[in-house]
Structure formats: structure tokens, C-alpha cells
A protein has these predicted regions:
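Acidic carboxylate-rich catalytic motifs and surrounding loops in phosphoryl-/glycosyl-chemistry enzymes
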Residues: 13-15, 129-136
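Acidic, His- and aromatic-enriched active-site or binding-groove loops in soluble protein domains
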Residues: 33-41, 146-181, 322-324
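Short, conserved phosphate-binding/catalytic loop or strand-edge motifs used
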Residues: 91-96, 132-140
Length: 371
């Protein structure tokens, strides 16, 4: 009744799904707990471990062609291996909602967060703590042209798991602190490359290689050899210091929303990242919309490192926790996934945002709060 009253209609994604989309787009924490087997036709299939991917595939297969925004909700069983304990089950009921095709991303993000917040309040839960983040903050820094391509690829692979990204940055800081600088004049070409923006180094080295003569290249072009040599050199070298510092600082932000956004702007200014500054400025509208939709921004914390362990998120993410300090305090979570529909069979990217919650965990909290 709650979802219908907000304009969301029911969908029923299948329980049995192809395993590949889940293996490709979920984080290791969920992938390692999936129930996967091979059907008689030789296809790898699974019991759905969550509902967003099946709903996105359903939308791509049969609803997208209708055009326009589409709001839907679901309630159904999902399956993840676990050692049964309080708040953790191998089969549990997941309820949630997805909003596909909303042209105004900020408005759609806040609509879905407010929908989740209101749903939990409708159950009788009042001590709710909202945390938000934005995966795009990190993507903006990784796209910076000062970052060497080899490091861009390496950090992009690590970024969905922020603990892994943190380790990469810590190891880089240790290398920079313990590795002496190369003696001046050690390599004229190396010095020249150091003074050249990362985006222009391929062309510079390829020009140098063309003076050697094609008989030394075999079947590869000077450009291919240049890229390979640069990848090796960049992988051994440090991360661009301004970007490394900005990434490390972002991972440390855990502040009330207004203070957190001010901190992100400061990080952007220090790093000289116009892209990150623009993203932080774009959050001002979300803050205003939160207040309009009944979620007090003063009670929201900004935690950019909150990727939720799921790899399909592309921007805004959020979690709502109860007031306990337990490991199972999270009641629901969600976020934006603008490229998921295309990756599961859609003909083009579709802006989308949604959330889900485990009903058993909510019922457990309600029982604990009952007089």
C-alpha cells in the first residue's frame, strides 16, 4: 500500500536467473555467497541474491520500449549463503523500489531516499540515521588527465572496494616515502617525460621511437610499443601526488552533510579538480530537496567511501541505519546505477536509482523496540 500510494507499481522478477550479470556487477561480498549451479542445458544459473539486477533486466526486456519514467516495487525472497545468526539468513525477504528513466537525477535520487525513509517510519521506526555518498567523486579524480593511464586502470579496478583502494594508496605513500628520487640527469628522456602531461606522453615517446627505424619494431607500431613501455614505467612509479592526496582525503570524510560537502570542496580546490568541485556543488540541490521531502539534512552524514560493496553504482548512494551500534544496524540501502540497464540487455544507458531492505531485519528491530 505504501509503494502504490507513492505511484510505484508491482513487478515480479524471476527467482532463477543467469549467473553472469550478478558475477559481473556485484561486489565480492555478495558474489562469494551466491547459490550457483549448471542447469541441464549447460547454462550457469543462480538463485537471485538481490532484486535490482533482475528488475533492471525485466525493464530492459519488456518495459523500456514503452518510453518515459517507470517506477516499480517488489517483494520477494532472495538467497545468499550465510551462517545463520540474528539478522542474517540464507533466505530472506527483500522489498524495494526502482525508478527508471528519471530525467532529473538529483530529484530522482532524493525521491527514492525519501521513499525508503518514509517506509521505515511507516513501520514505526523513528531513530533513523541516514548516510550518503557519491561514487562519482572518486570517478572524477580517476579521470584526471594528470593520473597516468596505468594507475588509472589499477585504481579503477580497486575503487569499488574502498578498502582495496585504501591499501593501494597506503602502499603508494610508503613507496614515495622510502624510494629516493632518481639522480638528476639520470635519463634525458625520463626527465622529458616527467615534464610532459600524462595524456601527451604516448605521442612523445612514439615520436622518439620512430627515429630508431621500423626494422626494430617487428609487427608492432611505435605507438603500441610506446604505450607498453609507458605502462611498465608508470606502474613502477608513484601516483600523481595531488590525486593520491585527494583520494586519501576523500576516503577519510565522515561528517554531517553540510560540513562534509565543504570538506569535499576543499579537497577539490587543493587538488585543482574542477570536476570534483562541480560534483560537490551539484549536491546543494539535493540538500534543498531533502528538506522539501521531509528528510532533515542536519541528520544526514556524508561518507564518500560508502560504495556499499556493490559494483554497479555510478553516483549517489545511501544507507539508513537504526540507532544501535550493532554490526547489523543497516536497515536499507540503495543508489544510482545509470549503466546497469544497458549491461543486462538494454539498447542504451538508462538513468536509474533504487533501494532495497530486508523485511526480517526490520521485523527484528520492531520486536526489540516493542514495550
Amino acid at each position: 500500500a505504501w509503494f502504490r500510494s507513492k505511484g510505484y507499481g508491482p513487478v515480479k522478477p524471476p527467482i532463477l536467473e543467469r549467473a553472469a550479470p550478478f558475477l559481473d556487477r556485484l561486489g565480492e561480498e555478495i558474489r562469494s555467497r551466491m547459490y550457483i549451479f549448471t542447469d541441464p542445458g549447460g547454462h550457469e544459473v543462480c538463485l537471485r541474491p538481490e532484486m535490482t539486477i533482475p528488475t533492471a533486466r525485466l525493464y530492459a526486456d519488456s518495459i523500456h520500449e514503452r518510453g518515459g519514467p517507470f517506477r516499480c516495487y517488489y517483494v520477494g525472497s532472495v538467497f545468499r549463503f550465510d551462517w545463520p545468526r540474528e539478522g542474517r539468513y540464507r533466505q530472506f525477504t527483500q522489498a524495494g523500489a526502482e525508478f527508471f528513466g528519471g530525467a532529473d537525477a538529483a530529484d530522482a535520487d532524493v525521491e527514492v531516499l525519501a521513499l525508503a525513509h518514509g517506509l521505515l517510519q511507516s513501520y514505526g521506526l523513528s531513530d533513523l540515521h541516514v548516510q550518503v555518498g557519491d561514487v562519482a567523486f572518486f570517478a572524477a579524480l580517476l579521470a584526471d588527465e594528470r593520473l597516468a593511464p596505468a594507475w588509472r586502470m589499477r585504481l579503477a579496478r580497486a575503487a569499488p572496494d574502498f578498502a582495496t583502494l585504501e591499501r593501494e594508496l597506503a602502499q603508494d605513500a610508503e613507496r614515495r616515502a622510502t624510494t629516493p628520487a632518481s639522480p638528476e640527469g639520470d635519463s634525458e628522456i625520463g626527465a622529458l617525460l616527467d615534464q610532459t602531461p600524462a595524456a601527451q606522453r604516448d605521442a612523445l615517446l612514439a615520436d622518439v621511437l620512430t627515429t630508431v627505424g621500423p626494422e626494430h619494431f617487428g609487427v608492432r607500431t611505435p605507438e603500441q610499443i610506446a604505450r607498453r613501455l609507458l605502462n611498465r614505467a608508470e606502474a613502477r612509479g608513484p601516483i600523481e601526488p595531488a590525486i593520491a592526496t585527494a583520494l586519501t582525503s576523500l576516503l577519510a570524510v565522515d561528517l554531517p552533510l553540510d560540513e562534509g560537502l565543504a570538506e569535499v570542496r576543499g579537497i577539490a580546490d587543493a587538488a585543482g579538480s574542477a570536476a570534483l568541485a562541480a560534483l560537490a556543488d551539484g549536491w546543494d540541490r539535493r540538500v534543498a530537496l531533502l528538506a522539501e521531502r521531509g528528510v532533515d539534512p542536519a541528520g544526514v552524514r556524508l561518507r564518500p567511501r560508502m560504495g556499499r560493496g556493490i559494483h554497479y553504482y555510478t553516483g549517489f548512494v545511501f544507507e539508513i541505519h537504526d540507532g544501535t551500534d550493532s554490526a547489523e544496524s543497516q536497515l536499507c540501502g540503495g543508489g544510482r546505477y545509470d549503466d546497469l540497464v544497458e549491461s543486462v540487455g538494454g539498447t542504451e544507458p538508462v538513468p536509474a536509482v533504487g533501494f532495497s531492505l530486508g523485511l526480517e531485519r526490520v521485523q527484528l528491530r520492531l520486536a526489540e523496540e516493542a514495550p
